[in-house]
């Protein structure tokens, strides 16, 4: 077993870190990958004398420890906690960072699952929230009250791909003693590292780009704040929403190719966005890589690429959006995102149905594309036939 769970020293390249951080070849066997420790419990040398710090798999597992070290390293963080899903990570963060009577600011187009958790669960515990367009710093500033404890940031947002200035919001948070959490799922650490920009916590649904193959569900919290990490760890263990060793293995395997995959996602997405922007059936294309996007300059400053997510609005409305989703052959009609295969969905009826009737309701003419890493010519041909 390797004793190195905190990454390699002296390595600066992100692609190299993603491959090597968290584990070195096993000194006994030479295995270059972390073994999958399918054990629920671990033998002790004496009462309370743990081997390598492991006692029970909910509390810790060598495979999960390696994944957490890798995630911390690629986000330029000190601490990371892995969870069984992105929503489990979200729930942990909210329970640690908020108390009854507190107030949280959220994006006015926040992910539907996050909205449902806050609106249906945390409001029962007397937690208030205010949806705000986070691209408008004056609106964020105006929403802060004496009870505000957290600003929940998505950038780019899901599904409208709005951009928030992480550095400016981080400065605002510090000025008012408000923590800033950034959901970095859409960008991934390959394109954006929020801790380096002033965020206190980074959240991931590792199901998406980090896992990258649509074969595992997971989540993560990364921070440089030891007190927060200890609180996250307490709930991770106490509530028990942890990934299995095999899920941790799949996630870590996906992480190794993240940088390479994101390069192709970026290339394909900008090509798709430019094609859609010129199509008469499309009234608007939402993609931060287009110079016409209102957040383009901020995205170019804080990201190393614009990502693989593209949203569009159909000129003929809801039924046209449904028809487009039904007609594609290469783009699969499915929820989720970030895998190697291209996906298409209508958020108002699928991933964001929980926002219907609320301030966060998603337009029903909106279609969201998760642009995969296939040959871009095939993707364009598929969209052409579906639109025509």
Swiss-Prot record:
The protein's required cofactors: pyridoxal 5'-phosphate
GO terms for biological process, alphabetical: cysteine biosynthetic process via cystathionine; methionine biosynthetic process; transsulfuration
Top-level taxon of origin: Bacteria
Annotated function: Catalyzes the formation of L-cystathionine from O-succinyl-L-homoserine (OSHS) and L-cysteine, via a gamma-replacement reaction. In the absence of thiol, catalyzes gamma-elimination to form 2-oxobutanoate, succinate and ammonia.
InterPro entries xref list: Cys/Met-Metab_PyrdxlP-dep_enz, Cys_met_metab_PP, PyrdxlP-dep_Trfase, PyrdxlP-dep_Trfase_major, PyrdxlP-dep_Trfase_small
Co-factor remark: Binds 1 pyridoxal phosphate per subunit.
Organism: Mycobacterium leprae (strain TN)
Keyword Ubl conjugation tagged: no
Any one Gene Ontology cellular component term annotated for this protein: cytoplasm
List of residues that carry N6-(pyridoxal phosphate)lysine: 208
UniProt EC number: 2.5.1.48
Gene3D superfamilies per the UniProt record, alphabetical: Aspartate Aminotransferase, domain 1, Type I PLP-dependent aspartate aminotransferase-like (Major domain)
Pfam family, one: Cys_Met_Meta_PP
Top EC class for this record: transferase
Record keyword Cell inner membrane present: no
Family: Belongs to the trans-sulfuration enzymes family.
Assembly information from the UniProt record: Homotetramer.
Cited SUPFAM superfamilies: PLP-dependent transferases (SSF53383)
Name of the protein in its database record: Cystathionine gamma-synthase
Catalytic reactions of this protein: O-succinyl-L-homoserine + L-cysteine = L,L-cystathionine + succinate + H(+)
Compartments in which it is found: Cytoplasm
GO MF entries: cystathionine gamma-lyase activity; cystathionine gamma-synthase activity; pyridoxal phosphate binding
Principal localisation: cytoplasm
PANTHER family: CYSTATHIONINE GAMMA-LYASE, TRANS-SULFURATION ENZYME FAMILY MEMBER
């Amino acid at each position: 077993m390797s004793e190195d769970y905190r990454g390699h020293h002296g390595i600066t390249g992100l692609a190299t870190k993603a491959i090597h951080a968290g584990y070195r070849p096993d000194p006994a066997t030479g295995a270059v990958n972390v073994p999958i420790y399918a054990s629920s419990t671990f033998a002790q040398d004496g009462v309370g004398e743990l081997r390598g710090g492991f006692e029970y798999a909910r509390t810790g597992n060598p495979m999960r420890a390696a994944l957490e070290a890798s995630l911390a390293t690629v986000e330029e963080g000190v601490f990371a906690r892995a969870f069984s899903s992105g929503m489990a990570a979200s729930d942990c963060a909210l329970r640690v960072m908020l108390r009854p009577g507190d107030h949280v600011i959220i994006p006015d187009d926040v992910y539907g699952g996050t909205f449902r958790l806050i609106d249906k669960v945390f409001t029962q515990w007397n937690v208030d929230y205010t949806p705000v367009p986070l691209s408008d710093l004056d609106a964020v500033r105006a929403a802060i009250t004496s009870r505000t404890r957290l600003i929940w940031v998505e950038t780019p947002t899901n599904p409208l791909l709005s951009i928030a200035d992480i550095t400016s919001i981080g400065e605002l948070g510090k000025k008012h003693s408000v923590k800033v959490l950034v959901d970095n799922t859409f960008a991934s650490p390959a394109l954006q590292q929020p801790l380096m920009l002033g965020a206190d916590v980074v959240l991931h649904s590792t199901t998406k780009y980090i896992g990258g193959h649509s074969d595992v569900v997971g989540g993560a919290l990364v921070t440089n704040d030891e007190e927060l990490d200890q609180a996250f760890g307490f709930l991770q263990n106490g509530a028990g929403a942890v990934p299995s060793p095999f899920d941790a293995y799949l996630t870590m395997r996906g992480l190794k190719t993240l940088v390479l995959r994101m390069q192709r996602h970026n290339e394909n997405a900008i090509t798709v966005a430019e094609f859609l922007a010129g199509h008469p059936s499309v009234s608007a294309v939402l993609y931060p890589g287009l110079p016409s996007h209102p957040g383009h300059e901020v995205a170019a400053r804080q990201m190393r690429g614009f990502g693989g997510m593209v949203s569009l609005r159909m000129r003929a409305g809801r039924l046209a959006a449904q028809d487009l989703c039904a007609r594609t052959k290469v783009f699969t009609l499915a929820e989720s995102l970030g895998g190697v295969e291209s996906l298409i969905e209508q958020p108002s009826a699928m991933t964001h149905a929980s926002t219907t009737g609320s301030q966060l309701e998603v337009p029903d003419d909106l279609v969201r594309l998760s642009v995969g890493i296939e040959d871009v010519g095939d993707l364009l041909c598929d969209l052409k036939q579906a639109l025509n």
